[in-house]
Amino acid sequence: MLGRPMKPSKCQECRDRAAWLDMFTALALAVFKTALGVLSGSMALQAHSLHSFGDFLTKGINLASVKLSSRPANSAFPYGYGKVQFLSANFIGISLMAGAAAMLWYNVTHLGSGHVQVPEVWAVFGALISAGTAELMHRYLRCVAEHTNSPAIMAAAADNRGDAYSSLAVLAGIVLSILGWVAADHLAAILVSLLVLRIGAVIAWDSIHGLMDGSVPSHRIDGIRQLLAAHHPGVSVVDLRGRRMGETWEVDLQLSISSQVTVEECHALTRELESRIAREEPHACHIRIRFIPQSGDATKTAVIETAAAVDEFAYLVEASAALRPLGHSRNGG
């Protein structure tokens, strides 16, 4: 999947397939860890299975948001449904934080009450399988997210990386508990909770950034600026900004050009710039370009050059003064 960006239809197929695979993988891991955690007596593995069940539910919502964001724009939503993926990512982040807080409370209270037990040795294999599966899913989803620019899939990738790290913490706790440190299993579960809490906060904050029209990455903006400087050195960039709209971006560009450029030339330049920017940045699907005259040209066009023009200007001033209401005069009289 590495290389040049895929075509939009291919991107959507790959993105949808990744969302389905992620959801059912979460369900399979949840069932597997629950069964093995109960049979082996590992509290950390049982706590981790609850997190996986929560993953399954949130990823179902994630899949629905990915499907909804593919709907074409209409009169009600002229820019499309892309931002629904930020809502989905926000829900995933909040759900992760809520589940982590519950898991943290559960293990702290059990550890404080002294209700600890040593897990069986086969719990080690469950933690290993969980860590390996989560890491593979993370790499696959991250690859898909980088090509499709999907915030929902990127959130799912980060979630799986958190699962991989937390599974390693569970593995360490199980091994230490078997070797004689009985409380290690619960301490590992507490560490898992704190890690998942942090991942959820990062996902939630990034989604809020997108919902509040956060800027596209600064290096992408710099790339567009360099593109203009390289191919159109006679055009000055007055303002260049971009915002995230789910998988796509909106780029707002204000350029300063000579007042001698005709309207037809402006239209031709606009089409050329839109095409060039779209080729370099495939996710820039909404490009708005405005032109203003260069400062020196603007000053020249504002100068009144002939006596006839001066007389006409004075006549307009007198006419406007005659039509002005008395209450609006400068001295109030």
From Swiss-Prot:
SUPFAM superfamilies in the record: Cation efflux protein cytoplasmic domain-like, Cation efflux protein transmembrane domain-like
Membrane topology note: Multi-pass membrane protein
Other observations noted: This bacteria makes up to 20 cubo-octahedral magnetosomes of about 45 nm in diameter which contain membrane-bound crystals of magnetite (Fe(3)O(4)).
Name of the protein described by the UniProt record: Putative transporter MamV
Subcellular location: Cell inner membrane
Record keyword Cell inner membrane present: yes
Keywords: Cell inner membrane, Cell membrane, Membrane, Transmembrane, Transmembrane helix, Transport
Gene disruption phenotype: No visible phenotype, magnetic response and magnetosome formation is wild-type. Deletion of genes mamH to mamV (amb0961 to amb0978) gives cells with no magnetosomes and no magnetic response.
Taxon lineage: Bacteria, Pseudomonadati, Pseudomonadota, Alphaproteobacteria, Rhodospirillales
Organism: Paramagnetospirillum magneticum (strain ATCC 700264 / AMB-1) (Magnetospirillum magneticum)
